[in-house]
């Protein structure tokens, strides 16, 4: 019971994190690409 709840919560957190990361990446795509180019 607790394990299932934990997995559900973990999955939910992962989905939320992916959504936030995707939104951030879409907004700052050029900035991230510039940073990656500078670092390498």
Swiss-Prot record:
It comes from the Viruses. Belongs to the coronaviruses NS3b protein family. This is Putative truncated non-structural protein 3b.
């Amino acid at each position: 019971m607790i394990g299932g709840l934990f997995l559900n919560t973990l999955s939910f957190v992962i989905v939320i994190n992916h959504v936030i990361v995707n939104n951030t990446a879409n907004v700052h795509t050029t900035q991230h690409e510039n940073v990656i180019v500078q670092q390498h």
